[in-house]
Amino acid sequence: DYLLAEPGSILAFNGITGCEEATKWKQNPTRYVVKRMEKFNSRRSEFGPMLYGEKYDQLYFASTRTPKGAGKDKDETTNAITGQRNNDLFLVKQDENGAWQAPIELEDEVNTEFDEGTPSFSKDGNTMYYTYCAQDPEGPRTSEIYISTRSSAKWGKGTRASIVKDSVTALGHPAISPDGKYLYF
């Protein structure tokens, strides 16, 4: 119906093509099985997984989950757009036997009362680039790329990456190149 109302709409065309392709994919499945990671998936929104560490034995991701151990009295700011709890960054580690452990929330220096998500790490693992979305009712609501550096075993307070001069351009979902010369977003 939408394509009839908007002939030539690329969105409508892509939607139809996606539905047609999905039925073909179901008829010809791959050998890969996608399943829920019961150890650390929750019923809340979770996205932006990024492996970390020399052995890739750590996984960072964003989630709207309430951190373990946080009582109902914990101050939680909800997102004005989604109505859900704001996203924070979480970390999951593998133990010496390769078993994934329960997720833990990152330090307060990175996680704030606003949205954080989609981390990317420098090759040496000492710099993290991530999306930060403040919700200033008096100012623009936009996403920015923040940078945090690791000292000892903790991430430091994130600082805004100076990429554009204005404060209303939305920047997010950073990915640093392996050589550290390029930041894709």
Sequence positions of predicted segments:
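Short, conserved micro-motifs composed of acidic
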Residues: L3-F185
